[in-house]
Amino acid sequence: MIGQKIPAGMTEKEYFEVHASQEEFLEWYHQQELPPYEKPSVTVDMVAYCFVEGKIKLFLIRRKAHPFQNCLALVGGFMDKGEDAAHACQREVKEEINLELPLEKIEQLVTVSTPGRDPRGWTVTIAHLVYLPSRALELVQAGDDAKEVVLVDVDFHTGKCYLDGKELVEKDFAFDHAAIIQESIRKIQEAIDYDPRFLYLLEDEFTVDDGLALVETLCPGKSCTSDRFLSKYGHSIEEVGFKRIPQKEVINIYRLN
């Protein structure tokens, strides 16, 4: 308890950190150590991709309020007290673009703590990759602090983003979100040979040809055959049926385990 006599030759800090019980330490810590430390605000931001007609699309919002009013931003927001980052992602995706997001489709990407990244004050963001099927396009609607939901094309060969055919530049984005998008491209391309989560960009059921088309889009020029695809990702997918195409052989259908 606070006010307990400290043995001679020992500092109060040493006593409570080393010799007291954890309950006594925490009581002392919250009274003695917390006030001098400033605390950052913590946000989550999501690089939310989908794969539509052979192109990678990125869900962004156009901010309706300061800071960076009218700029494009990743879906995200401040974490609530008592929630972890993944559940904050689920909540923000629901609030901002009206989508239900399963936890398995959320992948932590990078923590960004660059001083001055947010003009409102000290803010740390935990950025995530989010994989959405193309049917998500039919469900999105703007909410919360989003003026509108914007879908941009992302060229994984050049790293460039396009809106209505116009190339976007760094100043079009809020905060440091342009750099976070670039980091997401690098992460996906580095991990594609051993991490099958990118396959969540496909529909629930898909063919090997669908998977090959996605690999080629994410890693342009990368050579991948049907046999190699099944060798790499066979442990993560299961065969669920087949379909017949006129004048062609039967094609197997798969889904992620």
Which positions does each model-derived feature cover?
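N-terminal leader/linker segments that precede catalytic domains of diphosphate-processing enzymes
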Residues: 1-168, 173, 178-257
